[in-house]
């Protein structure tokens, strides 16, 4: 059984200082037994990154749609796991106003980092919260999950304007703003006619990321984890898809020649 201090030591062993901006996708079950359970996991993260910015995805794409269009950041539950919903209840945590792909954070300049998402019309709009990870030296920590849960790669594809990733027609949604007013939002969703779950193909990039040292294998609790450098991940994807922008979905595998020039 892991204690809070042991979990914090594992974060230190990853080479993280606690001053970074870190987005964590997680599976609580994969972490194993923890003294105090999920609350202790959150305590470890919040305390360790107390001088940085801790971010968790709080997506609502599963339950906010044309039939159920109203997103209320104070009430709409996250559809991406136990820890994310518990995080939303913590004092000091701020949630963005993106109606389908919100993010919550606590720490250094959290409100500033999360601001403006109500103006986006795609899941991971260039310049938005996911894309901002690149400009601040941000990391993505995948705890017990793989790149199929790495939302940052969706943002990379949006920045690089990869075709056939978004619906042509937007959904009309509504956002309950912090002051209680309602803002209409016209949101395109992830869509590919041949692959209903685009992110499942992101695992094809795993070896490229490891070879290029954009991603390292680490451990948190019992969980096998991947620690990703956002800018380095962006560069690997950019090189890999340059000859064929749709290859992550359309190719059964990606040839090593696509990333050999980046291997250090």
For the regions a language model picked out, list residue spans one by one:
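Internal, conserved structured core segments that host functional sites
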Residues: 65-155
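N-terminal basic/disordered segments at the start of proteins
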Residues: 2-9
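Acidic/aromatic/glycine-rich contiguous surface patches that form carbohydrate-binding/processing clefts
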Residues: 188-264
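Short, solvent-exposed amphipathic alpha-helical segments in soluble enzyme
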Residues: 39-41, 156-161
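Glycine-rich phosphate/diphosphate-binding loops that line cofactor/substrate pockets in enzymes
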Residues: 11-21, 133-136
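Short, flexible loop segments at boundaries between secondary-structure elements
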Residues: 51, 164-193
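Amphipathic alpha-helical segments in well-structured domains
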Residues: 4, 38-42, 80
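N-terminal active-site beta-alpha-beta segment that forms phosphate/nucleotide-binding
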Residues: 17-67
């Amino acid at each position: 059984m892991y204690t809070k201090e042991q979990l914090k030591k594992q974060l230190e062993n990853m080479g993280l200082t606690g001053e970074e901006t870190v987005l964590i996708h997680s599976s609580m079950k994969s972490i194993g037994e923890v003294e105090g359970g999920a609350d202790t996991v959150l305590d470890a993260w919040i305390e360790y990154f107390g001088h940085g910015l801790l971010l968790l995805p709080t997506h609502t794409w599963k339950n906010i749609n044309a039939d159920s269009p109203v997103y209320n950041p104070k009430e709409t539950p996250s559809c991406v796991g136990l820890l994310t919903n518990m995080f939303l209840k913590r004092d000091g945590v701020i949630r963005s106003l993106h109606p389908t792909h919100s993010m919550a954070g606590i720490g250094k300049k959290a409100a500033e980092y999360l601001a403006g998402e109500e103006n986006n019309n795609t899941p991971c709009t260039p310049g938005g919260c996911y894309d901002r990870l690149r400009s601040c030296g941000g990391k993505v920590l995948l705890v017990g999950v793989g790149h199929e849960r790495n939302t940052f790669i969706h943002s990379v594809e949006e920045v690089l304007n990869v075709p056939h990733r978004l619906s042509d027609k937007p959904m009309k949604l509504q956002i309950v703003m912090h002051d209680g007013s309602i803002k209409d939002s016209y949101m395109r969703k992830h869509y590919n006619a041949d692959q209903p779950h685009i992110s499942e193909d992101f695992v094809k990039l795993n070896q490229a990321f490891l070879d290029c040292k954009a991603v390292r294998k680490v451990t948190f609790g019992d969980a096998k984890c991947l620690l990703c450098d956002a800018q380095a991940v962006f560069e690997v994807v950019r090189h890999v898809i340059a000859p064929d922008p749709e290859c992550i979905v359309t190719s059964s595998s990606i040839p090593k020649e696509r990333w050999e020039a980046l291997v250090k």
